[in-house]
Regions:
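Short, well-ordered alpha-helix to beta-strand connector turns
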Residues: 34, 54, 109-112
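ATP-dependent small-molecule kinase phosphotransfer cores
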Residues: 1-50, 64-65, 76-78, 91
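Conserved phosphate-donor/acceptor-positioning beta-strand/loop module used by diverse small-molecule
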Residues: 52-89
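Solvent-exposed amphipathic alpha-helical surface segments
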Residues: 31, 74, 93, 97-100, ...
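Small-molecule kinase domains that catalyze NTP-dependent phosphoryl transfer to phosphate-bearing small molecules
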Residues: 46, 78-128
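Short, amphipathic alpha-helical "lid/cap" segments that border enzyme active or binding sites
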Residues: 17-25, 122-133
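Conserved short-loop catalytic and cofactor-binding motifs
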Residues: 8, 12, 55, 113, ...
Length: 136
């Protein structure tokens, strides 16, 4: 399923987001030995913030062109079309998350750290995140 397909599914059925976010929050509050050490999701920083969890909340920021290049590398396609599709997806997601939860994923309020990853490769992003986790 592509990002666009998933976005369309979520737009048509808000229950998809509600169920996924409920599962995500369940995992975030676990304290057993099998609890996840790292959780990645567009809203995980928000949920950790709203749940009052004392944990690093990291937002990876990338510019529109770099985001499109990464999608292109993963899924193929025309770069200009991907830029347009990403903008449309972001607009739809903003409307959906505002309707569901009254928040926008890209608002930086809940995040303890923001990494501009536009000029970083995957290994550099990982190193930056590990540095934050080791210091926390």
């Amino acid at each position: 399923m592509t990002l666009a397909d998933f976005g369309q599914l979520c737009k048509e059925d808000l229950e998809v987001d509600r169920q996924l976010d409920a599962l995500l929050k369940e995992q975030m509050v676990r304290t057993d030995d099998e609890a996840p050490s790292v959780i990645e999701s567009r809203l995980s920083g928000w949920w950790a913030y709203k749940l009052g969890l004392s944990t690093p909340r990291i937002w990876l920021e990338v510019d529109d062109l770099e985001r499109a290049k990464r999608v292109q590398a993963r899924e193929g396609g025309d770069l200009d079309s991907i830029v347009d599709a990403n903008k449309q997806r972001s607009k739809i997601d903003e409307q959906r998350f505002d309707e569901l939860y009254g928040l926008l994923p890209q608002q930086t309020e809940p995040y303890t750290h923001i990494i501009n990853a536009s000029d970083l490769n995957a290994q550099e992003v990982l190193a930056s995140v590990l540095h934050i986790l080791e210091e926390y």
